């Protein structure tokens, strides 16, 4: 394996931060006062990212709720995905005894809040205003410990999603069947089938057939938790169809097999092309991001320690022994495009770089228009930038 890392060509003018962070200025409904949340759930702990005061940037961020029984792994998921905690270190985390609010915005393209709920939360407690919390929530993630008896968890799942659906039917409901690293493949499939069947039967009995649950097998000891969170976050991105379309156009004109648009900090992929996601390919791309950041921390910082491990000049090429090439390029301050292609296709690097320049410009236009209009933009937004894409070296305007 060979690694090439260094500065790329002159960056696109204004690229560093031009597209900035996704829903920073999008309207997701006004969030209630933080004091209300504290009164509703016995206090809200300040997250590592720090919370903004009422009326600040918090009011435009989608909210993701992490719920589940005690010791199901909720806090571990949050720490591993968004705070780079080693999975082994999560063994020393204390149980959550109050609502813990984590603001994911200062160092990530993915701009939202995660509320980690204690396992003993009682919805029938008159002092708990669950309606206030469920209003304005983008997604509810319910974590079930697959290695434990999950009958009580299924009962709590049904109560939780039923109440949430009545308050906010537009919310996405996600179920993480967690800690599956200790189960055999057959046991994983059987556990997922059983939980899926029982949960949906309970909803059908309650007349909630329209309530859709999405199920994921997850573990903090592999990349499954990152992939699951990627799919959860993608549902909250109004520009997702546009991003997928841009990626499809880019790879079809550049001879690329697979491309991911990554949030560098969390390793969540914001979008990918329409071809199926192979877990091994995703893991390769995640590992490449780790390598690039680690190498950059060693050689990319200034003598006084200033600078950034990832900036507008970041670019890396890794050539594997099986003639596969991994190619990483900076898109925005927090986004990177990671491509998988064959060595013979990479011989046309000039073509790929030109098409990437057009792709990056289109991405910036998508989010600039989105911030201005407070709504997801259509495909017309980026049409002008993609007209210049070349196919087999021939400019579009020359065809």
Curated annotation (Swiss-Prot):
Pfam families, sorted: Gtr1_RagA
GO molecular function: enzyme-substrate adaptor activity; GDP binding; GTP binding; GTPase activity; GTPase binding; magnesium ion binding; molecular adaptor activity; protein heterodimerization activity
Impact reported for residue 90 to N: In LNGODS; also found in patients with follicular lymphoma; maintains the GDP-bound state leading to constitutive activation of mTORC1; results in altered regulation of TOR signaling
List of residues binding GDP: 71-76, 90, 94, 96, 178-179, 181, 219-220
Effect in UniProt of substituting residue 92 to A: Promotes interaction with GATOR1 in the GAP mode
Effect annotated for changing residue 99 to F: Found in patients with follicular lymphoma; increased activation of mTORC1
Enzyme Commission designation: 3.6.5.-
Gene Ontology biological process terms in this record: apoptotic process; cellular response to amino acid starvation; cellular response to amino acid stimulus; cellular response to nutrient levels; cellular response to starvation; DNA-templated transcription; negative regulation of autophagy; positive regulation of TORC1 signaling
Binding site for GTP: 74, 90, 96, 181
Positions bearing Phosphothreonine: 96
Residues annotated with Phosphoserine modification: 2, 15
GO CC terms of this entry: cytoplasm; cytosol; FNIP-folliculin RagC/D GAP; Gtr1-Gtr2 GTPase complex; intracellular membrane-bounded organelle; lysosomal membrane; lysosome; nucleoplasm
Modified residues (N-acetylserine): 2
Reactions the enzyme catalyzes: GTP + H2O = GDP + phosphate + H(+)
UniProt keyword annotations, A-Z: Acetylation, Cardiomyopathy, Cytoplasm, Disease variant, GTP-binding, Hydrolase, Lysosome, Membrane, Nucleotide-binding, Nucleus, Phosphoprotein
Cellular localization per UniProt: Cytoplasm; Nucleus; Lysosome membrane
Inhibition and activation profile: The activation of RagC/RRAGC is mediated by a GTPase activating protein (GAP). In high-amino acid conditions, activated by GTPase activating protein FLCN that stimulates RRAGC GTPase activity to turn it into its active GDP-bound form. In response to amino acid depletion, the GATOR1 complex inactivates RagC/RRAGC by securing the GTP-bound inactive form.
Family membership: Belongs to the GTR/RAG GTP-binding protein family.
Summary of the function given for this chain in its UniProt record: Guanine nucleotide-binding protein that plays a crucial role in the cellular response to amino acid availability through regulation of the mTORC1 signaling cascade. Forms heterodimeric Rag complexes with RagA/RRAGA or RagB/RRAGB and cycles between an inactive GTP-bound and an active GDP-bound form: RagC/RRAGC is in its active form when GDP-bound RagC/RRAGC forms a complex with GTP-bound RagA/RRAGA (or RagB/RRAGB) and in an inactive form when GTP-bound RagC/RRAGC heterodimerizes with GDP-bound RagA/RRAGA (or RagB/RRAGB).
Quaternary assembly: Forms a heterodimer with RRAGA, in a sequence-independent manner, and RRAGB. Heterodimerization stabilizes proteins of the heterodimer. The GDP-bound form of RRAGC (in complex with the GTP-bound form of RRAGA or RRAGB), interacts with RPTOR, thereby promoting recruitment of mTORC1 to the lysosomes. Component of the lysosomal folliculin complex (LFC), composed of FLCN, FNIP1 (or FNIP2), RagA/RRAGA or RagB/RRAGB GDP-bound, RagC/RRAGC or RagD/RRAGD GTP-bound, and Ragulator. Interacts with NOL8.
Disorder named in the UniProt entry: Long-Olsen-Distelmaier syndrome: An autosomal dominant syndrome characterized by lethal dilated cardiomyopathy, bilateral cataracts, mild facial dysmorphisms, and liver dysfunction. Some patients have brain abnormalities, including pachygyria, polymicrogyria, and septo-optic dysplasia. Death occurs in infancy. RRAGC mutations have been found in a patient with idiopathic dilated cardiomyopathy with ventricular dilation and systolic dysfunction, bilateral cataracts, and mild facial dysmorphisms.
Record's protein name: Ras-related GTP-binding protein C
């Amino acid at each position: 394996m060979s690694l090439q890392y260094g500065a790329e060509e002159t960056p696109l003018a204004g690229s560093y931060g031009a597209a900035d962070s996704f829903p920073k200025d999008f309207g997701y409904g006004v969030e209630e006062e933080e004091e209300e949340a504290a009164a509703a759930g016995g206090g809200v702990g300040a997250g590592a990212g720090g919370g903004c005061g009422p009326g600040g940037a918090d009011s435009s961020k989608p909210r993701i709720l992490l719920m589940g029984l005690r010791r199901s792994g909720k806090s571990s998921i949050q720490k591993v995905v968004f705070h780079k905690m080693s999975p082994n270190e999560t063994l020393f985390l204390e149980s959550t005894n109050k609502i813990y609010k984590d603001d994911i915005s200062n160092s990530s393209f993915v701009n939202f809040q995660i509320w980690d709920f204690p396992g003993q939360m009682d919805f029938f407690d008159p002092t708990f205003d669950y309606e206030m919390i469920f209003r304005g929530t983008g997604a509810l993630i319910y974590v079930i410990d697959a290695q434990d008896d999950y009958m009580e968890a299924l009962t709590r799942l049904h109560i939780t999603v039923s109440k949430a659906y009545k308050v906010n039917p537009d919310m996405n409901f996600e179920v993480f069947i967690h800690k599956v690293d200790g189960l055999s493949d057959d046991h994983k499939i059987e556990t997922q089938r059983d939980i899926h069947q029982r949960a949906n039967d309970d909803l059908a009995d309650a007349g909630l057939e329209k309530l859709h649950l999405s199920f994921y097998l997850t573990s903090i000891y592999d990349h499954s938790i990152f992939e699951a969170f990627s799919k959860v976050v993608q549902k909250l991105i109004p520009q997702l169809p546009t991003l997928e379309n841009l990626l499809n156009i880019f790879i079809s004109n550049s001879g690329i097999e697979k491309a991911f648009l990554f949030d560098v900090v969390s390793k969540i992929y914001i979008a990918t092309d329409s071809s199926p996601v192979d877990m091994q390919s995703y893991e390769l791309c995640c590992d490449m991001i780790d390598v690039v950041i680690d190498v950059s921390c060693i050689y990319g910082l200034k003598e006084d320690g200033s600078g950034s491990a990832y900036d507008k000049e970041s670019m890396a090429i890794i050539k594997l022994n099986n003639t596969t090439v991994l190619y990483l390029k900076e898109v925005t301050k927090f986004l990177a495009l990671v491509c998988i292609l064959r060595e013979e296709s990479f011989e046309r690097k000039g073509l790929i770089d030109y098409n990437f320049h057009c792709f990056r410009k289109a991405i910036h236009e998508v989010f600039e228009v989105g911030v201005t209009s407070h709504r997801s933009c259509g495909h017309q937004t980026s049409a002008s930038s993609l007209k210049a894409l070349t196919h087999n070296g021939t400019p579009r305007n020359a065809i």
